[in-house]
Protein backbone atom coordinates (compact mmCIF):
# COMPACT_ATOMS: atom_id res chain seq x y z
CA UNK A 1 0.00 0.00 0.00
CA UNK A 2 1.43 3.40 -0.97
CA UNK A 3 0.26 7.00 -1.37
CA UNK A 4 0.68 8.28 -4.90
CA UNK A 5 -0.11 11.52 -6.68
CA UNK A 6 -2.15 10.89 -9.78
CA UNK A 7 -1.91 12.73 -13.06
CA UNK A 8 -5.02 14.62 -11.99
CA UNK A 9 -3.23 16.20 -9.05
CA UNK A 10 -5.13 14.24 -6.42
CA UNK A 11 -3.49 11.97 -3.87
CA UNK A 12 -4.63 8.40 -4.21
CA UNK A 13 -3.92 5.35 -2.09
CA UNK A 14 -2.77 2.49 -4.29
CA UNK A 15 -4.02 -0.87 -3.02
CA UNK A 16 -3.07 -3.98 -4.96
CA UNK A 17 -6.09 -6.16 -5.53
CA UNK A 18 -5.52 -9.67 -6.80
CA UNK A 19 -7.74 -10.98 -9.54
CA UNK A 20 -10.60 -13.00 -8.15
CA UNK A 21 -11.76 -16.29 -9.54
CA UNK A 22 -14.62 -16.58 -11.95
CA UNK A 23 -13.85 -13.42 -13.92
CA UNK A 24 -15.25 -14.88 -17.16
CA UNK A 25 -12.61 -13.22 -19.32
CA UNK A 26 -12.98 -9.64 -18.03
CA UNK A 27 -9.55 -8.64 -16.82
CA UNK A 28 -9.27 -8.57 -13.04
CA UNK A 29 -13.01 -8.42 -12.42
CA UNK A 30 -14.44 -10.05 -9.34
CA UNK A 31 -18.03 -11.26 -9.41
CA UNK A 32 -18.36 -11.01 -5.63
CA UNK A 33 -21.03 -8.65 -4.43
CA UNK A 34 -19.84 -5.87 -2.16
CA UNK A 35 -21.15 -5.58 1.38
CA UNK A 36 -20.87 -3.08 4.19
CA UNK A 37 -18.91 -3.71 7.35
CA UNK A 38 -18.26 -1.80 10.53
CA UNK A 39 -14.50 -2.16 10.85
CA UNK A 40 -13.57 1.06 9.08
CA UNK A 41 -13.98 4.64 10.25
CA UNK A 42 -15.67 5.33 6.93
CA UNK A 43 -18.16 2.50 7.26
CA UNK A 44 -16.58 -0.24 5.14
CA UNK A 45 -14.45 -3.16 6.29
CA UNK A 46 -11.14 -3.53 4.44
CA UNK A 47 -12.09 -6.73 2.60
CA UNK A 48 -15.47 -5.37 1.57
CA UNK A 49 -13.86 -2.14 0.40
CA UNK A 50 -11.55 -4.10 -1.89
CA UNK A 51 -14.49 -6.10 -3.22
CA UNK A 52 -16.39 -2.89 -3.96
CA UNK A 53 -13.44 -1.26 -5.73
CA UNK A 54 -12.72 -4.41 -7.75
CA UNK A 55 -16.35 -4.84 -8.79
CA UNK A 56 -16.80 -1.18 -9.76
CA UNK A 57 -13.52 -1.15 -11.68
CA UNK A 58 -14.67 -4.19 -13.66
CA UNK A 59 -18.09 -2.73 -14.42
CA UNK A 60 -16.63 0.62 -15.49
CA UNK A 61 -14.01 -1.12 -17.63
CA UNK A 62 -16.77 -3.00 -19.42
CA UNK A 63 -18.67 0.22 -20.05
CA UNK A 64 -15.57 1.92 -21.44
CA UNK A 65 -14.81 -1.04 -23.73
CA UNK A 66 -18.37 -0.99 -25.03
CA UNK A 67 -18.16 2.76 -25.64
CA UNK A 68 -14.84 2.45 -27.48
CA UNK A 69 -15.71 -0.50 -29.69
CA UNK A 70 -19.42 -0.08 -30.42
CA UNK A 71 -19.59 3.63 -31.11
CA UNK A 72 -23.35 3.50 -30.44
CA UNK A 73 -24.05 1.22 -33.41
CA UNK A 74 -26.14 -1.84 -32.57
CA UNK A 75 -27.06 -0.50 -29.14
CA UNK A 76 -30.07 1.62 -29.97
CA UNK A 77 -33.28 0.00 -28.80
CA UNK A 78 -31.72 -3.46 -28.53
CA UNK A 79 -30.51 -3.05 -24.99
CA UNK A 80 -26.95 -2.69 -23.78
CA UNK A 81 -26.56 -6.39 -22.98
CA UNK A 82 -27.99 -7.45 -26.33
CA UNK A 83 -25.91 -4.91 -28.23
CA UNK A 84 -22.74 -6.13 -26.61
CA UNK A 85 -23.60 -9.73 -27.35
CA UNK A 86 -24.33 -9.05 -31.02
CA UNK A 87 -21.45 -6.66 -31.55
CA UNK A 88 -18.68 -8.52 -29.75
CA UNK A 89 -19.76 -12.14 -29.75
CA UNK A 90 -18.04 -13.04 -33.00
CA UNK A 91 -14.91 -10.94 -32.69
CA UNK A 92 -12.88 -13.57 -30.84
CA UNK A 93 -10.08 -13.04 -28.31
CA UNK A 94 -10.59 -10.22 -25.85
CA UNK A 95 -13.84 -9.11 -27.49
CA UNK A 96 -15.39 -12.54 -27.14
CA UNK A 97 -14.30 -12.86 -23.51
CA UNK A 98 -15.62 -9.38 -22.73
CA UNK A 99 -18.91 -10.16 -24.43
CA UNK A 100 -19.41 -13.36 -22.47
CA UNK A 101 -18.39 -11.74 -19.20
CA UNK A 102 -20.61 -8.71 -19.55
CA UNK A 103 -23.62 -10.65 -20.74
CA UNK A 104 -23.20 -13.02 -17.78
CA UNK A 105 -22.54 -10.31 -15.19
CA UNK A 106 -24.71 -7.50 -16.48
CA UNK A 107 -27.03 -8.90 -19.11
CA UNK A 108 -30.24 -9.03 -17.10
CA UNK A 109 -30.01 -5.53 -15.70
CA UNK A 110 -28.70 -4.03 -18.89
CA UNK A 111 -31.29 -5.68 -21.12
CA UNK A 112 -33.94 -4.26 -18.79
CA UNK A 113 -32.36 -0.84 -19.11
CA UNK A 114 -32.18 -1.25 -22.85
CA UNK A 115 -35.89 -1.91 -23.09
CA UNK A 116 -36.54 1.22 -21.04
CA UNK A 117 -34.08 3.30 -23.01
CA UNK A 118 -35.32 1.99 -26.34
CA UNK A 119 -38.65 3.68 -25.74
CA UNK A 120 -36.90 7.01 -25.28
CA UNK A 121 -34.36 7.09 -28.09
CA UNK A 122 -36.39 9.66 -29.99
CA UNK A 123 -36.67 12.00 -27.03
CA UNK A 124 -34.87 15.30 -27.37
CA UNK A 125 -34.05 15.27 -23.65
CA UNK A 126 -31.78 12.24 -23.90
CA UNK A 127 -28.23 12.78 -25.15
CA UNK A 128 -26.69 10.44 -27.74
CA UNK A 129 -24.66 8.84 -24.97
CA UNK A 130 -27.76 8.28 -22.84
CA UNK A 131 -29.42 6.66 -25.82
CA UNK A 132 -26.45 4.40 -26.51
CA UNK A 133 -26.35 3.28 -22.89
CA UNK A 134 -30.09 2.70 -22.73
CA UNK A 135 -30.66 5.39 -20.10
CA UNK A 136 -33.84 7.37 -19.59
CA UNK A 137 -32.32 10.60 -18.33
CA UNK A 138 -35.72 11.89 -17.24
CA UNK A 139 -36.19 9.10 -14.69
CA UNK A 140 -33.74 10.57 -12.18
CA UNK A 141 -35.05 13.16 -9.74
CA UNK A 142 -33.36 15.19 -7.02
CA UNK A 143 -36.16 14.34 -4.59
CA UNK A 144 -37.99 11.04 -4.51
CA UNK A 145 -41.24 11.60 -2.66
CA UNK A 146 -44.35 9.52 -3.13
CA UNK A 147 -47.50 8.46 -1.35
CA UNK A 148 -46.32 4.89 -0.82
CA UNK A 149 -43.11 3.19 0.20
CA UNK A 150 -42.18 2.24 -3.33
CA UNK A 151 -39.02 2.00 -5.35
CA UNK A 152 -38.21 3.76 -8.61
CA UNK A 153 -35.55 3.73 -11.31
CA UNK A 154 -33.37 5.85 -9.04
CA UNK A 155 -33.04 2.92 -6.61
CA UNK A 156 -31.59 0.61 -9.29
CA UNK A 157 -27.79 0.59 -8.74
CA UNK A 158 -27.04 -0.37 -12.34
CA UNK A 159 -29.23 2.46 -13.65
CA UNK A 160 -27.43 4.88 -11.34
CA UNK A 161 -23.96 3.68 -12.34
CA UNK A 162 -24.76 3.87 -16.04
CA UNK A 163 -26.18 7.37 -15.67
CA UNK A 164 -23.12 8.60 -13.74
CA UNK A 165 -20.79 7.05 -16.32
CA UNK A 166 -22.78 8.78 -19.06
CA UNK A 167 -22.53 12.16 -17.30
CA UNK A 168 -18.79 11.80 -16.70
CA UNK A 169 -18.07 10.84 -20.31
CA UNK A 170 -20.08 13.84 -21.47
CA UNK A 171 -18.10 16.09 -19.10
CA UNK A 172 -14.83 14.70 -20.46
CA UNK A 173 -15.62 14.55 -24.16
CA UNK A 174 -18.91 16.35 -24.83
CA UNK A 175 -21.77 15.19 -27.05
CA UNK A 176 -20.67 13.95 -30.45
CA UNK A 177 -17.01 13.60 -29.38
CA UNK A 178 -17.23 10.51 -27.22
CA UNK A 179 -17.75 7.74 -29.77
CA UNK A 180 -21.50 7.42 -29.27
CA UNK A 181 -22.38 8.62 -32.76
CA UNK A 182 -20.07 6.29 -34.63
CA UNK A 183 -21.14 3.79 -37.24
CA UNK A 184 -22.33 0.27 -36.60
CA UNK A 185 -18.92 -1.00 -37.68
CA UNK A 186 -17.63 0.06 -34.29
CA UNK A 187 -14.72 2.13 -33.07
CA UNK A 188 -11.15 1.47 -32.01
CA UNK A 189 -10.63 -1.44 -29.63
CA UNK A 190 -8.32 -0.61 -26.70
CA UNK A 191 -5.40 -2.98 -26.37
CA UNK A 192 -5.06 -5.27 -23.38
CA UNK A 193 -2.42 -2.92 -21.96
CA UNK A 194 -4.69 0.09 -22.38
CA UNK A 195 -7.57 -1.77 -20.76
CA UNK A 196 -5.40 -2.71 -17.80
CA UNK A 197 -4.15 0.88 -17.49
CA UNK A 198 -7.72 2.22 -17.49
CA UNK A 199 -8.78 -0.30 -14.85
CA UNK A 200 -5.77 0.66 -12.71
CA UNK A 201 -6.71 4.33 -12.98
CA UNK A 202 -10.26 3.57 -11.83
CA UNK A 203 -8.98 1.33 -9.02
CA UNK A 204 -6.46 3.89 -7.75
CA UNK A 205 -9.04 6.70 -7.72
CA UNK A 206 -11.76 4.68 -5.96
CA UNK A 207 -9.32 3.16 -3.47
CA UNK A 208 -8.10 6.62 -2.53
CA UNK A 209 -11.61 7.99 -2.13
CA UNK A 210 -12.88 5.04 -0.09
CA UNK A 211 -9.74 4.78 2.02
CA UNK A 212 -9.04 8.44 2.69
CA UNK A 213 -12.49 9.93 2.25
CA UNK A 214 -13.93 12.41 -0.20
CA UNK A 215 -12.89 15.15 2.24
CA UNK A 216 -9.21 14.49 1.49
CA UNK A 217 -9.78 14.96 -2.24
CA UNK A 218 -11.49 18.30 -1.57
CA UNK A 219 -8.86 19.38 0.94
CA UNK A 220 -9.65 18.89 4.64
CA UNK A 221 -13.38 18.87 4.18
CA UNK A 222 -13.46 21.43 1.40
CA UNK A 223 -14.18 24.12 4.02
CA UNK A 224 -10.83 25.84 4.30
CA UNK A 225 -9.90 26.56 0.72
CA UNK A 226 -10.66 23.13 -0.72
CA UNK A 227 -11.77 22.93 -4.30
CA UNK A 228 -15.42 22.25 -4.96
CA UNK A 229 -17.14 20.76 -7.96
CA UNK A 230 -14.85 19.37 -10.64
CA UNK A 231 -11.95 21.72 -9.94
CA UNK A 232 -8.59 20.01 -9.91
CA UNK A 233 -10.01 16.59 -10.76
CA UNK A 234 -9.64 16.56 -14.54
CA UNK A 235 -13.37 15.94 -15.00
CA UNK A 236 -13.48 18.73 -17.57
CA UNK A 237 -11.19 16.75 -19.86
CA UNK A 238 -8.10 18.87 -19.15
CA UNK A 239 -6.09 15.85 -18.03
CA UNK A 240 -6.63 14.23 -21.44
CA UNK A 241 -5.34 17.17 -23.44
CA UNK A 242 -8.69 17.78 -25.10
CA UNK A 243 -8.62 14.42 -26.91
CA UNK A 244 -11.75 12.56 -27.91
CA UNK A 245 -12.31 8.99 -26.78
CA UNK A 246 -11.32 7.58 -30.17
CA UNK A 247 -8.11 9.65 -30.12
CA UNK A 248 -6.78 8.22 -26.87
CA UNK A 249 -3.65 6.16 -27.40
CA UNK A 250 -1.40 4.27 -25.02
CA UNK A 251 -1.57 3.25 -21.36
CA UNK A 252 -0.90 6.77 -20.04
CA UNK A 253 -3.98 8.20 -21.74
CA UNK A 254 -6.16 5.32 -20.60
CA UNK A 255 -4.91 5.43 -17.01
CA UNK A 256 -5.73 9.14 -16.87
CA UNK A 257 -9.18 8.39 -18.29
CA UNK A 258 -9.70 5.67 -15.68
CA UNK A 259 -8.58 8.01 -12.91
CA UNK A 260 -11.01 10.69 -14.10
CA UNK A 261 -13.90 8.21 -14.35
CA UNK A 262 -13.16 6.67 -10.93
CA UNK A 263 -12.86 10.11 -9.35
CA UNK A 264 -16.09 11.23 -10.98
CA UNK A 265 -18.02 8.18 -9.78
CA UNK A 266 -16.56 8.63 -6.30
CA UNK A 267 -17.58 12.28 -6.18
CA UNK A 268 -21.09 11.76 -7.55
CA UNK A 269 -22.16 8.60 -5.72
CA UNK A 270 -22.91 10.02 -2.28
CA UNK A 271 -24.57 13.22 -3.47
CA UNK A 272 -26.76 11.25 -5.87
CA UNK A 273 -27.67 8.83 -3.06
CA UNK A 274 -28.73 11.75 -0.85
CA UNK A 275 -30.83 13.16 -3.70
CA UNK A 276 -32.49 9.78 -4.14
CA UNK A 277 -33.60 9.27 -0.53
CA UNK A 278 -37.33 8.72 -0.84
CA UNK A 279 -40.13 9.58 1.59
CA UNK A 280 -43.83 8.83 1.69
CA UNK A 281 -46.77 10.26 3.63
CA UNK A 282 -50.08 8.88 4.86
CA UNK A 283 -51.42 12.39 5.49
CA UNK A 284 -50.32 15.99 5.10
CA UNK A 285 -48.74 15.92 8.57
CA UNK A 286 -47.20 12.42 8.78
CA UNK A 287 -44.15 11.39 6.74
CA UNK A 288 -41.72 8.47 6.72
CA UNK A 289 -38.42 7.69 5.01
CA UNK A 290 -38.78 4.78 2.59
CA UNK A 291 -37.54 1.49 4.05
CA UNK A 292 -34.77 1.00 1.51
CA UNK A 293 -33.28 4.41 2.38
CA UNK A 294 -33.39 4.18 6.16
CA UNK A 295 -29.78 3.04 6.64
CA UNK A 296 -28.58 6.19 4.92
CA UNK A 297 -31.15 8.29 6.78
CA UNK A 298 -29.71 6.89 10.01
CA UNK A 299 -26.28 8.32 9.10
CA UNK A 300 -27.89 11.71 8.57
CA UNK A 301 -29.73 11.34 11.88
CA UNK A 302 -26.49 10.61 13.72
CA UNK A 303 -25.08 13.86 12.37
CA UNK A 304 -28.24 15.70 13.48
CA UNK A 305 -27.98 14.22 16.98
CA UNK A 306 -24.56 15.88 17.37
CA UNK A 307 -26.16 19.33 17.01
CA UNK A 308 -29.45 19.50 18.97
CA UNK A 309 -29.05 23.28 19.18
CA UNK A 310 -29.34 23.37 15.36
CA UNK A 311 -31.86 20.62 14.62
CA UNK A 312 -33.79 20.27 17.88
CA UNK A 313 -35.59 17.00 18.61
CA UNK A 314 -37.77 15.02 16.19
CA UNK A 315 -41.53 15.46 16.46
CA UNK A 316 -44.28 13.07 15.41
CA UNK A 317 -47.98 12.38 15.30
CA UNK A 318 -49.51 9.00 16.14
CA UNK A 319 -52.30 9.62 13.67
CA UNK A 320 -53.61 12.30 11.30
CA UNK A 321 -54.92 15.28 13.21
CA UNK A 322 -53.59 14.05 16.55
CA UNK A 323 -51.42 16.03 18.95
CA UNK A 324 -47.84 16.77 17.89
CA UNK A 325 -45.40 15.20 20.33
CA UNK A 326 -41.66 15.55 20.82
CA UNK A 327 -40.02 12.17 20.30
CA UNK A 328 -37.89 10.66 23.04
CA UNK A 329 -35.95 8.81 20.34
CA UNK A 330 -32.81 10.17 18.72
CA UNK A 331 -32.96 11.49 15.18
CA UNK A 332 -31.07 8.42 14.02
CA UNK A 333 -33.66 6.06 15.50
CA UNK A 334 -36.69 8.17 14.60
CA UNK A 335 -35.62 8.21 10.95
CA UNK A 336 -34.54 4.57 10.68
CA UNK A 337 -37.08 2.88 13.01
CA UNK A 338 -40.14 5.13 13.08
CA UNK A 339 -42.69 2.44 14.02
CA UNK A 340 -46.04 4.20 13.43
CA UNK A 341 -44.76 7.62 14.47
CA UNK A 342 -45.22 9.82 11.41
CA UNK A 343 -42.73 12.69 11.31
CA UNK A 344 -44.19 16.19 11.21
CA UNK A 345 -43.54 18.61 8.32
CA UNK A 346 -41.31 20.72 10.60
CA UNK A 347 -39.16 17.69 11.43
CA UNK A 348 -38.95 16.66 7.78
CA UNK A 349 -37.79 20.19 7.03
CA UNK A 350 -34.97 19.75 9.57
CA UNK A 351 -34.05 16.42 7.96
CA UNK A 352 -33.88 18.04 4.52
CA UNK A 353 -31.84 20.89 6.00
CA UNK A 354 -29.30 18.37 7.33
CA UNK A 355 -29.19 16.63 3.94
CA UNK A 356 -28.45 19.97 2.30
CA UNK A 357 -25.62 20.71 4.74
CA UNK A 358 -24.02 17.32 4.11
CA UNK A 359 -24.33 17.75 0.34
CA UNK A 360 -22.74 21.20 0.57
CA UNK A 361 -19.85 19.81 2.60
CA UNK A 362 -19.38 16.94 0.14
CA UNK A 363 -19.31 19.38 -2.78
CA UNK A 364 -16.81 21.68 -1.05
CA UNK A 365 -19.33 24.53 -0.91
CA UNK A 366 -17.43 27.16 1.04
CA UNK A 367 -20.28 29.64 0.64
CA UNK A 368 -22.72 27.77 2.91
CA UNK A 369 -22.63 29.77 6.14
CA UNK A 370 -24.38 26.97 8.05
CA UNK A 371 -21.21 24.88 7.79
CA UNK A 372 -19.26 27.41 9.85
CA UNK A 373 -21.36 26.80 12.98
CA UNK A 374 -19.81 25.46 16.19
CA UNK A 375 -21.39 22.98 18.54
CA UNK A 376 -20.81 22.03 22.17
CA UNK A 377 -17.12 21.99 23.04
CA UNK A 378 -16.21 23.85 19.86
CA UNK A 379 -17.01 21.00 17.47
CA UNK A 380 -17.26 22.06 13.83
CA UNK A 381 -20.57 21.37 12.12
CA UNK A 382 -18.90 21.57 8.72
CA UNK A 383 -16.24 18.99 9.53
CA UNK A 384 -18.79 16.65 11.10
CA UNK A 385 -20.98 17.07 8.01
CA UNK A 386 -18.00 16.12 5.84
CA UNK A 387 -17.35 13.03 7.96
CA UNK A 388 -21.00 12.03 7.60
CA UNK A 389 -20.61 12.61 3.88
CA UNK A 390 -17.58 10.30 3.75
CA UNK A 391 -19.58 7.50 5.38
CA UNK A 392 -22.57 8.10 3.09
CA UNK A 393 -20.32 8.18 0.02
CA UNK A 394 -18.83 4.81 0.95
CA UNK A 395 -22.29 3.36 1.54
CA UNK A 396 -23.36 4.61 -1.88
CA UNK A 397 -20.29 3.14 -3.58
CA UNK A 398 -20.92 -0.15 -1.78
CA UNK A 399 -24.44 -0.27 -3.22
CA UNK A 400 -23.17 0.54 -6.71
CA UNK A 401 -20.54 -2.18 -6.39
CA UNK A 402 -23.23 -4.70 -5.53
CA UNK A 403 -25.14 -3.95 -8.75
Swiss-Prot record:
Keywords from the named record: Hypersensitive response elicitation, Secreted
Predominant localisation class: secreted
Bias-annotated ranges (Low complexity): 113-129, 137-156, 174-187
GO biological process: symbiont-mediated perturbation of host programmed cell death
Record-level GO cellular component terms: extracellular region
UniProt record similarity statement: Belongs to the harpin HrpN family.
Protein name as annotated: Harpin HrpN
Organism this protein belongs to: Erwinia amylovora (Fire blight bacteria)
Gene name linked to the record: hrpN
Amino acid sequence: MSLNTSGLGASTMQISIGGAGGNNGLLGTSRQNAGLGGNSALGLGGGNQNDTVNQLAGLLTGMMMMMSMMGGGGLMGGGLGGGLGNGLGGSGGLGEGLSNALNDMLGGSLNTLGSKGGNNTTSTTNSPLDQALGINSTSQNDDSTSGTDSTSDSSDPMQQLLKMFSEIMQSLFGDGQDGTQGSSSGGKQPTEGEQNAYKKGVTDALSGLMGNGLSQLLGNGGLGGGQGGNAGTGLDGSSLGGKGLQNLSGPVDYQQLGNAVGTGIGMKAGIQALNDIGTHSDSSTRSFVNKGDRAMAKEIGQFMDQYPEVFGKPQYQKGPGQEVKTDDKSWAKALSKPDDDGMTPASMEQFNKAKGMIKSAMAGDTGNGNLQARGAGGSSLGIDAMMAGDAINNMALGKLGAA
